[in-house]
Amino acid sequence: MTNPKLPPILINKAGSVYYVYTYKNIWDRELKRSKRGESKKIGTILGGQKEGKIRFDEAFLQEHPEFRNYQVERKGKDYVFTPISEEGITLEQARNIKKLHAGATWALDQIVADSPVGEFLKECFPRHKDYKKILSLAYFLILNQNNNVSFYESFAETTRLPYPRALSPSAVTRLFQRIELRDVQRYFSLMRSYLQEDEDNKIILALDSTSISSYSTNLTHIEYGKNKDDDALPQLNVLFLVDQKSGLPIFYRFYDGNVPDVSTIRHTIADQALLNMKNVVLVADKGYNSVKNINDCLINKVEFIFNVRLGTKGCLARELIDEHRKEFADLNSGDPYIRKNIATAKVNWKYDPRPVDGKPASNTASAELYYHMFYDPVIYQEAANKLTESLLTIKKKLLEEEALTEQEEELKEKFFRNDKEKGLVIVNRRVDEYLKYKGFRVLVTDSEKDPVKAWTAYADRWRVEDAFATLKDRLGCNRIRCSDNKALQGKTFVQFIATGLSLMVRSRIRSYMRENKKAGKLNLVYESDSKILQVLNNVMQTRFNHGYYFDEVAGKKIKYFEALDVRVPGAGPETPEEVPEEPETEPLLGTDIEI
């Protein structure tokens, strides 16, 4: 078969891409010789080099259909023709072409590049390119929504990832075992330095914990305790600190499953000291407020905003509410922004600056605390309506001799009494007592005098709750799926990184929707973050020996990249990074990895 004849060709570079042009010579009457006339683009050299395979433009192939049957490659000044099979590819191409899911991981790469996460991982985990492996596993958790790493190898075979080689289950286990506590603490330290670059502003950290269940009996921290998912399984507890400004989780620690939340503040403060964090305000929910925790914060000069429990009769918060009831009845106490009635009480708090176990507290030190009280009449009315509806339903069932549910029996015992003349009647005094503190919230703080700012800081702690929802629901990490203590540290850290990246994705989508609403634009993105990433994951990338090429991106996928504030991947090639294959060795002796 005779090769077709190429027209005159020029090679011109634009940016990082070499383009192929053809031209025609024309006669110059003045110079009395031929010269090069107008040129026309006919193709692109693949691979980003001056030599390589040529991808001809469709317009050229329509004019010269004979070139459809050949792969043309530029080598030096020569052009090599390779016949193409009926399937449209050469045999060499058939061996080396590979399609990868790439759009979602491309977007995640851009988000990582805009944050300190990738840089800090590289600094802390440079060996064996572990930082790339950690990111790749984090992407797997985000896109696969399952933390069973036995699925990772097949996922990596078909997905564009920072670490381009697939990792076997044993290689993943070795990675987890290499992630040591000192390296994790180094990462936390770098994150702390990043947050404290703006020395003028306080760092507000939302603090909370959750329980993660396990079937394993080998892990040190696994104990039966108060399971927050109502699983009848032993658990370990994981505590997160989340920066409320950026939404980034910056610290975690796990502890025994039978340790209540209220007991963890002291250890967290100790960890804070290790991190050498300054100018920090801890924001925590009711489970963390106690006299001991307030004292520990004051002793260690850690500022705090705690939500106070109101369920205990005779507690200080209830007394303060009762003292200020007239203020709550005054409509002028309502704030137009948070839509709550507000009152604040200053309390002179006594504490022992140097407590010793077993000795009575000296209470020689004192601090001024602010008890900010908030009343929402709507919440009160909702509680009153719900209770009234339940009590009237019970009354109706009793009159019609219908059976009561277990919950209704409890309400009957609590709010009804037998009257000799009227029979079973509702005791209004008990109802009033039950509703007396409904609609109230009390925040105690040593530093924030402004009640609205305190409320806002507390309201923003949804970020840590969002972190746990992301970890357990969206990433499928409600089970540990690890039975080795040495690997647990590494797996938890990878899940921590995945949680942070997922929260950054959600934050960008929220910001996009908020800006559209502010500008009065039509919001074209309604799907959840996971749905958006799944759609983008179907943006494919074709891999050749000489590079990677994204398929054309069109339609709503362009809008999704815009919602994530990342650029659409271009047509130019990505050059694959060569990484050595990790040798297959067994996990460290004495380990038992459940995957």
How would you label these PLM feature ranges?
Residues 1-206, 210-216, 240-253, 258, ...:
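Dynamic "connector" segments at or just before major functional cores
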Residues 15-19, 230-236, 244, 435-438, ...:
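Short, flexible loop/turn motifs enriched in small residues
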Residues 262-279:
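Short, basic/hydrophobic alpha-helical segments
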Residues 273-274, 294-303:
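Short, surface-exposed basic-aromatic patches at helix termini and helix-loop junctions that form
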Residues 283-292, 310-313, 486-489:
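Acidic, metal-coordinating catalytic cores used for nucleic-acid/nucleotide bond scission
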Residues 453-481:
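Short amphipathic alpha-helical "interface-anchor" segments enriched in bulky aromatics
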Residues 483-505:
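Basic, amphipathic alpha-helical segments enriched in Lys/Arg and hydrophobic/aromatic residues
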